[in-house]
Amino acid sequence: VSLCKRRGFIFQSAEIYGGLNGCWDYGPMGVELKRNLKEYWWRKNVQEREDVVGMDGSILTHNSVLVASGHVGGFSDPMCDCLLTKERLRADQVPAQSGMGFFYTGAAKKDGSWNIEKKYSVLVESEKQADKARKTAAQYYAQLAGKDASYKDMELKGECMETVTDSTMYNPANGSLLTEAREFNLMFKTTIGATSDENDPNATGWLRPETAQSIFCQYKNILDSSRVKLTFGIAQIGKSFRNEINPRNFTFRSREFEQMEIEYFCRPEDGLRLVDEWLEHRLCFYDEVGVPREHIHILDVPDGERA
């Protein structure tokens, strides 16, 4: 990342104000690199092919479009929060853990300055780590009380121990109890119109989570207005947005990103043959832009795991 910044390829968005996590600004070198890649992709996949046409769809997306596609109801991840650090984790990625659970009903400062009645628990490897569990619990209750205190300065109430087996209710990093899982929508929602009601579905809009939906919506118009017929494709390059919980891996997992996409329409009986043809076409393209095919892993996704 530091090399890309020094050479003028990419910078953290709003860096002088602390940075906007998951968003990046491309500098003089980066914007030229992107432009070259997009122009080459468009030339190879649209201009040099007779079976692919292009379009440029709106970023703002009608609520009904994403209701119909299943995004409004299902484009979400189950999330839970660490009660101690407030870190947000994917609930379905928390590993099952076993060990000794220390359970508490509350805590109070020994001098009587505060008292909290709230259940909490900590998971440690064994009873021998009792001090670690108590310290974690003390940190949790001290946060609730708004005070900086150690377990030596407070009384932990109702302590009991119990063997815990294959539980996904604890943060693997520190043993703290997690909140119950809840669904977290991964799309950016907005309201359309100056006097719009955010609870009115007709005034609700979204920043598109992918470019595919506008292609599907305009399929009939493109079919009627262009000299195309099955089998053919529609290509699009454009921005998409996803409210990633934990943006990571540099630009790979970001909240705003650019896609180059082709939706290819064919008769069912031609599908498998065309997949093989397009696979070879893509491998040749990547090789041309400097990614040798021996560096690419081709994964055959089983039917039950496909989106």
Which stretches of residues belong to each language-model region?
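TRNA-recognition modules of translation machinery and tRNA-sensing kinases, especially anticodon-binding
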Residues: V1-A307
